[in-house]
Design a protein with these regions (language model features):
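Residue-level signal for inorganic ion chemistry
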Residues: 51, 146, 236, 314
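C-terminal accessory subdomain/extension
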Residues: 241-367
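A charged N-terminal "starter" segment
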Residues: 1-80, 86, 94, 102, ...
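Active-site loop/helix belt of alpha/beta enzymes
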Residues: 18-35, 90-104, 111-235, 242-243, ...
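A structural signal for short, hydrophobic beta-strand segments that form beta-sheets
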Residues: 62, 236, 292-293
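Hydrophobic "anchor" residues on beta-strands that sit immediately upstream
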Residues: 13, 104-106, 145, 291
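C-terminal helical cap(s) of enzyme catalytic domains, especially alpha/beta-barrels
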Residues: 49-55, 220-229, 337
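Flexible, glycine/charged-enriched surface loops at secondary-structure junctions
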Residues: 9, 183-188, 326-331
Length: 367
């Protein structure tokens, strides 16, 4: 569906950093490779090497910092590196030239995110363009791409839309200036994150770079008829019935007001269940939502089954998924959906399905 949305001429980069937002980078990358994606993006060389070690051969871009001592590994394993400033460009050039190799780079432009990239806004424009031109001519470096990152492309108010367009216009001005000054033609110009991929087709350029959208979350995914990839489930391990006036869990945050049947589920903050959600959310059972009660513990949490007769030990409980959207839980936690998906810890087993069939299981303990 994303391919249909962006059209046949625009390349597709799948962002799989942070273990593919908690979904499993290797498994997601393999699937994207099979489906014909053009590029992957990660945050670090460790993430890139994990993909290479597991048979992922397609181009990989590191968006974050890589120490200069690792340039040889980047070249050896055909990994592309983001260059964010003059100092990094010079470091990478010296290392690559000394090794007699060529490192592919994508140059990052800071157009308003105020994080990484050549600063090109206002009085910094000429200096930024000059620095990018210099990087393009350094020995040992091949400038394959240039990119920027939008700060509010996912916001639809007029002020945010205007800011995104200013960022895009500045990015295009920088590209034109570099092309005119040095005659450089970047094969890959990209700036469209999830929001821009969904809402600004004129900003797709040579390649789009969706993150959260790739996993089917948020209003943009709904607009494109995409479904969430992850369903997080557990089971009820035990039940107890308490009399009125019984306090539950640490800090006595919740006290029963009536005769209450409580279930314990083996999912706590060490697994990714935010402690700030204590007594503020519900988990979904086959008979309906079960309010979470009391303080969420490290390894377990409690749910109220009083109004759900028939729900018992061994029954499945959906923490988030199709019947209990992660967006709702994220709002209750005062955060964003991908903070919740990224937080699902490694001790939570992953089961991968395709067309309803289990294709792989990933467990913390391997026997």
């Amino acid at each position: 569906r994303l391919r249909q949305h962006i059209g046949p001429k625009v390349r597709f980069l799948g962002v799989v950093k942070a273990d593919a937002y908690g979904h499993g980078a290797v498994q997601v990358a393999r699937t994207l490779q099979e489906l014909g994606a053009d590029y992957l993006a990660v945050s670090s060389i460790d993430e890139a090497m994990e993909l290479r070690a597991n048979g992922v051969t397609m181009p990989v871009l590191i968006l974050g910092h890589t120490p200069k001592e690792q340039v040889g590994r980047l070249i050896e394993h055909h990994i592309t590196q983001a260059v964010t400033c003059k100092a990094k460009a010079l470091e990478y050039s010296r290392e690559a030239a000394a090794l007699g190799g060529t490192l592919k780079i994508h140059i990052k432009v800071d157009t308003g995110m105020s994080r990484l990239g050549y600063l090109c806004d206002g009085s910094h424009f000429d200096g930024g363009v000059e620095g990018i031109c210099e990087a393009c001519g350094l020995p040992g470096l091949e400038a394959e791409g240039i990119f920027t990152h939008f700060a509010v492309a996912d916001e639809q108010d007029q002020e945010s839309q205007a800011y995104t367009r200013r960022q895009f216009d500045l990015f295009c001005r920088v590209i034109r200036a570099v092309e005119e000054k040095r005659g450089v033609r970047f094969p890959l110009r990209h700036c469209a994150n999830t929001g821009a991929t969904a809402c600004y087709p004129e900003m797709h350029l040579d390649m789009v770079r969706p993150g959260l959208l790739l996993y089917g979350y948020g209003e943009f995914a709904q607009g494109l008829d995409l479904r969430p990839v992850m369903t997080l489930k557990t089971t009820i391990s035990t039940t107890k019935t308490y009399e009125p006036g019984t306090s539950v869990s640490y800090g006595r945050l919740f006290t029963t007001q009536r005769r209450t049947r409580m279930g314990v589920v083996p999912y706590g903050y060490a697994d990714g269940f935010f402690r700030c959600l204590s007594d503020r959310c519900s988990l979904m059972t086959a008979k309906g939502p079960a309010p979470q009660r009391g303080r969420i513990c490290m390894d377990m949490s409690m749910i109220d089954l009083t109004d759900l007769p028939g729900v018992d030990v061994g029954d499945e409980v959906e923490i988030f998924g199709p019947h209990n959207p992660v967006e709702v839980m994220a709002a209750q936690a005062g955060t964003i959906p991908y903070e919740l998906t990224c937080a699902v810890s490694k001790r939570v087993p992953r089961v991968y399905l395709q067309n309803g069939q289990v294709t792989e299981r990933e467990l913390l303990l391997r026997f």
